[in-house]
């Protein structure tokens, strides 16, 4: 089977830099797609699977340890951004609030941002963090694509049922929204996710 063009492009992704605040980010130009997810949603694993790189995004035994915005460059005009994870981080409330403020600044003011990929554990969908990101997407009219991660943990029928339930709950979402099943373990949904990333980043899928 021929390699998906986005798989090939993403495999070339290189770590560019980390930033805590908006003014530390790379120049605000080109196109960026950001990846968000609460702790334990499988965000780093999803990024590593989609890029075909085992350790591009750091995975940690302690969820919530990634406290910075991490930028990965595909080329001069295109980047992926790994946003901080939330949920189980063993830090003070004031520190969590500080992270939240920096994330809000990035999401609301970053002109290069063209889409948000939200990782949502299919066994625990629509938690507070997910709802917060959906609300921000609605307010900013920012396209959002949801990966229902860890789909391999459920039988296909149960996974599909959960997907349809979440889809029904979000049908009134005012911003462009799409969702799919995904598994970093067995590769379920990679083609669909690559298609969406290619659309947002302006990389067309070449027909054979």
Swiss-Prot record:
PROSITE patterns: G_ENGB. Mg(2+) binds at residues 44, 66. This is Probable GTP-binding protein EngB. Residues 29-203 form the EngB-type G domain. Belongs to the TRAFAC class TrmE-Era-EngA-EngB-Septin-like GTPase superfamily. EngB GTPase family. GO terms for cellular component: cytosol. It comes from Alcanivorax borkumensis (strain ATCC 700651 / DSM 11573 / NCIMB 13689 / SK2). Disulfide bonds: none annotated.
């Amino acid at each position: 089977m021929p390699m998906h063009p986005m798989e090939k492009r993403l495999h070339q992704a290189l770590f560019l830099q980390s930033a805590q605040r908006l003014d530390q980010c790379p120049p605000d130009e080109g196109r960026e797609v950001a990846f968000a997810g609460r702790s334990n949603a499988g965000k780093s694993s999803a990024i590593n699977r989609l890029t075909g790189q085992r350790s591009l995004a750091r995975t940690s035994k302690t969820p919530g340890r990634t406290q910075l915005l991490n930028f990965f460059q595909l080329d001069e005009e295109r980047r992926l951004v790994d946003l901080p994870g939330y949920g189980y981080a063993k830090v003070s409330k004031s520190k969590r609030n500080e992270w939240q403020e920096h994330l809000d600044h990035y999401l609301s003011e970053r002109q290069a941002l063209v889409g948000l990929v939200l990782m949502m554990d299919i066994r625990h969908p629509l938690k507070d963090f997910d709802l917060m990101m959906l609300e921000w997407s609605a307010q900013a009219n920012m396209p959002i694509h949801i990966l229902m991660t860890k789909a391999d943990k459920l039988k296909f029928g149960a996974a599909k049922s959960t997907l349809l339930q979440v889809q029904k709950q979000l049908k009134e979402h005012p911003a462009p929204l799409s969702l799919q099943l995904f598994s970093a373990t067995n590769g379920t949904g990679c083609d669909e996710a690559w298609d969406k990333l290619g659309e947002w980043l302006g990389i067309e899928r070449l027909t054979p």
